[in-house]
Every structure is written in C-alpha cells, then in structure tokens.
Design a protein with these regions (language model features):
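CE4/NodB-like, metal-dependent polysaccharide N-deacetylase domain
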Residues: 76-97, 117-121, 143
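Beta/alpha (TIM)-barrel catalytic core signal, keyed to glycine-rich beta->alpha loops juxtaposed to Asp/Glu
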Residues: 100-265
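N-terminal binding-site loop/beta-alpha segment at the start of enzyme catalytic domains
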Residues: 1-60, 114, 183, 264-265
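Residues at the N-termini of beta-strands
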Residues: 33, 91-94, 125-126, 151
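Short, acidic/polar
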Residues: 14-27, 72-87, 108-110, 135-138, ...
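A short, structured active-site edge motif that brings together acidic residues
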Residues: 57-70, 91-100, 155-156
C-alpha cells in the first residue's frame, strides 16, 4: 500500500485550465498526491489529467471525499463507485467523509459503517474523516474501533492551530492532513514568518508549510503557477529550529477560513 506523500496538490475551487495547470505541472515537478472531492465537481477532469500526465496510477496517492448528501443508508458506496468511474480508476488510496452530517441528520454510524464496507470491498485502501471535532472523532473511533480511521483532514495553519484536534489524532494514531495551510495567503503577510523566512532564504509560505511538515502533518496547498508549485515542494527541505517552531506557535488566533453555516461547533 502506497504511503501518503507529505505534500499534495489540493484541487478545491480548481476547474478547467487552472486545474490543468496545477495538476500537469505539479505531476511533472514530482508531486504524487492529489486531493479532490465529490463536491468540487472536478473528479472527471482530475481523472482525465492523471491519465494525460503519463504518471502510472499506482504512483499517485489519490483522495476523494464523500459529500453530506450521500450519507443515507445505501448511498455511500454507490457515490464512491461514481467517483471511481469519473476518476478513471478502480480504487482510491483514501476516501474521507467530507464533513460530519449537518445537525446529525444522518446518524454517524450509518455513514461510517458504509465507508468501512467500501474499504472491505476494495474501493478504497484507507478511510478517514474531515472537519470532525474532538467529540466527533471520539464517536467515530467508538463506532469503527481503534485503528479504523486512518486520517483526519482539517484546516490547520499558524493562525488556526486546532491543537485539541491534533492532540487527539496523535494519541489515536490518526494521521493529519492540513488543508488551507497558507490560510488563503494570509500567512504571506505575517511579519514573523517573513522574518524567519529571510533567515532561511525562503518565503513566509514555505515557512508555514515547513512548520506543519515538521509536526508530521501532510499539507495540500493549491497553486496553478509553476514557480509556486516548485516553491511548495522545496518547503520539504526547510528545517526550522525548535525556537522558531515555538515562535510560530504563538501566532494562533482562531482565524478560520473554511466556516460554512453547517460546520460543527
């Protein structure tokens, strides 16, 4: 089973030419991890571009996410089969529940047990969740048992560090993928990150990514520009001191970028 590469290509809000620019250039530069979702409405294009790239499917770690409309009894697996068809593949590396069911409209056990069944049937190699609170993560572990939930994908960056969620995941061996790791570009203007970057000869964005990577997280920034895609990859080589790591931790201010009206409290 392929291990998830620590740096991936996020595809949220990318379609048409921007998606083409991001994926084809990214794969050419050496990215081997693509993150998409049913609600992004770009799975078919992602599949086409993966095929066009010439990179063998088995060399790409592919994640998609099941949308909340597909949680009801008997719906999760057919929705993943549609995703697989669009993506032009017969398996996913990771299938995630995109958000917990709004207001618990569908009981968690209903959709998580279907997701586990999708794994048992070979539709996906690993399963996980996204945007779950600590209470919801506890419930998920109780439903499926220890070790079943392999990943939690959640918004994390220096301005929103989600420490309680991170601690819970670490204690339960749940790997973390940080989405929006640059806070929609807000981190680029942070004086502390710029100052640390100058010290290392790198950008504030690279410092933000390096800070997350140093904590053992996977990051999935999105970019359509070749120079930014290459710079994000180069963040893998940035080594921050323990003092710098601690300084960056002081930037926490609960600044959430992804906050739809159905998000859990």
């Amino acid at each position: 089973m392929m291990k998830m590469p620590n740096l991936g290509l996020g595809t949220f809000r990318l379609k048409d030419q921007p998606l083409r620019d991001s994926l084809l250039q990214g794969l050419e530069l050496g990215y081997r991890h693509i993150d998409t979702a049913q609600i992004y409405d770009n799975e078919a294009d992602v599949g086409q571009l993966m095929s066009e790239s010439g990179v063998p499917r088995q060399e790409i770690y592919l994640t998609t996410k099941v949308w909340t409309s597909e949680f009801g009894p008997g719906k999760v697996i057919p929705s993943l089969e549609v995703s697989l068809e669009k993506l032009g593949t017969d398996y996913l590396d990771l299938a995630l529940i995109h958000w917990p069911s709004p207001q618990d409209e569908v009981p968690m056990a209903v959709y998580l047990e279907q997701l586990a069944e999708a794994k048992a049937r070979g539709l996906t190699r690993e399963i996980g969740v996204s945007n779950f609170t600590v209470a919801q993560l506890k419930q998920a572990v109780e439903i499926l048992g220890p070790g079943a939930i392999a990943h939690q994908q959640v918004e994390i960056h220096p301005l929103l560090q989600n420490r309680k969620v991170v601690e819970f995941c670490q204690e339960h061996c749940i790997a973390i993928t940080a989405y929006m790791p640059l806070a929609y570009g807000k981190v680029l203007a942070e004086p502390l990150l710029m100052e640390i970057g100058q010290r290392h000869g790198v950008s504030a964005a690279q410092v933000s990514l390096a800070w997350l990577l140093a904590q053992g997280m996977t990051v999935i920034p999105s970019s359509t520009k070749r120079e930014n895609l290459a710079a994000n990859l180069a963040a893998l080589k940035v080594r921050l001191s323990s003092d710098e790591m601690a300084q960056i931790a002081t930037l926490e201010r609960g600044e959430r970028c992804a906050n739809p009206d159905f998000a859990p409290n």
